[in-house]
Amino acid sequence: MAFDNEFTLGIEEEFQIIDPETRELRSRVNEMLEEGRMLLGEQIKPEMHQSMVEVGTGICNNIKEARRDVIHLRRTIAELAYKNGLAIAAASTHPISHWADQRITEHERYAQLIEEIQHPARALLIFGLHVHVGIQDKEAAIAIMNAARYFLPHVLALSTSSPFWIKQNTGLKSYRSEVFKQFPRTDIPDYYNSWSEFENYVNLLIKTGCIDNGRKIWWDVRPHPFFPTLEFRVCDIPSKVDETICIAALFQSIVAKLYKLFRQNLGFRLYRRALIQENKWRAVRYGLDGKLIDFGKQKEVPVRSLLLELLEFIDDVVDELDCREEVNYLHTIIENGNSADRQLRVFKQTGDLRDVVDGLMRETVEGIFQVA
């Protein structure tokens, strides 16, 4: 099956803006935006807290193109930060800084969010990775979303980067996930029997004043309300470019594999949200060191083993997508650990969260200035 520009990619990363002297967050995104918009146009934007900057790739035809774009974006905002005496870091929580010390961006959207959601919105000082995979067929998109839910805890465990929160070791590998759960319409979605059933759900929420559009459905995976993509939102932002690219390639491959099964009328067993939620909690708590439940076998299996099984599951599509090298980086993450693991190792060695921040700042720009 030739894919022919199916499964295009878009990657959004949200970065911390840091004072490299104090290692604290700084609400200074506006100092980066004027020149940033000249260089990147709509690819750079502020978020609710002014200590965050978001960048997003264009529509990429393959993972190689996505890598070039991600590196270019990281390099550009790192240089913008440096010009202003700042630095950037990629992790889903800041180890030290408090949300109450960050300024809120003046924008009607954020004012409305805070008015509606109150404290959970003000405290939403978390940073994410969103991966869009193109899919034109709406019925296929819903079927793929239903099946892809099963793999969300697996990839979350691979990505975890938020063990610390306001100077505390939370004991979780992805504290970001717990912070975001305080918002409505988040977490693992239920499954839908058709596009029309999903559309009826969205229209009901709009009709009854719950939301004004589908953008306020913040599930871990969702059909994008305005673009023909499935948007994967479950992951922490990895610190290293190679990790981001590996995760994006995994999501692209999962979509391509499930689409292939859909076209062949081969079913994929759908599990209830409550069951997948059990696995998500395990990924949040333990990351790569945990065990997930294999629901078919009704037993616990180490995350690392399940990730290797995931590689086998997608093996027959990765060459057509030209992403074998990128998904195989999973072996490196399994062997060496992810951002959360490295942060915890540094803290165990030095006992100083400033050293953790230093490591994040280094890893975020690792290798990006050696690439033309």
Write out the residue ranges for each language-model feature.
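C-terminal accessory/tail domains of diverse enzymes
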Residues: 1-84, 113, 180-372
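An acidic- and aromatic-residue-enriched active-site/binding cleft used to recognize and process polar
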Residues: 20, 86, 91-96, 129, ...
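Well-ordered mid-protein domain cores that form the structural environment of catalytic cofactors
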Residues: 61-126
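Metal-dependent DNA replication initiation modules
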Residues: 91, 95, 108, 113-129, ...
